[in-house]
UniProtKB/Swiss-Prot annotation:
InterPro entries: Hydgase_Ni_incorp_HypA/HybF_CS (IPR020538), HypA/HybF (IPR000688). HAMAP family: HypA_HybF. It comes from the Archaea. This is Hydrogenase maturation factor HypA.
């Protein structure tokens, strides 16, 4: 269900942009999926295609880019990637992080110094990184 809500927000944003720009056709949407969010791209794509039916975006190309999750310790400066520690997560933890990425601080610590004071440098959230439209008179 979470993926459908994300798809709805992406589609509405893309269609609003296309309308503001006077587009006759929405050709493509490029979406970045942060690894930390652990979103199922297949479900999002299916939902987006369904939501685009009957609109100027029907048949639009949908591209996903996965952005790797990277963390940086505020105490020692060490940087590490989610994939380096993800194996220690059980399904409950993965689900918690999926719905509320901020809880990652409760489950992770810097692998170098053990601090839980770290920032998410990249790989959090879902956002549109590109929209391609066709305006009147363009081919």
């Amino acid at each position: 269900m979470h993926e459908w809500a994300l798809a709805d927000g992406i589609v509405r944003t893309a269609l609003d942009y296309a309308q503001r720009e006077g587009a006759k056709k929405l050709l493509a949407i490029q979406v970045v999926l942060g690894e930390l969010q652990d979103v199922n791209a297949e479900i999002v794509e299916f939902a987006m295609k369904e939501l685009l039916k009957g609109t100027i975006g029907e048949g639009a190309e949908i591209e996903f880019i996965e952005e790797e999750a990277v963390f940086k310790c505020r105490d020692c400066g060490h940087e590490w990637k989610l994939k380096e520690v993800k194996g220690s997560f059980d399904e409950r933890i993965k689900e918690d992080i999926h719905f509320i990425p901020e809880v990652v601080h409760a489950f992770l610590a810097c692998p170098k110094c053990g601090s839980r004071d770290f920032e998410v440098v990249q790989g959090r959230g879902v956002y549109i990184s590109g929209i391609k439209i066709e305006k009147e008179g363009e081919a």
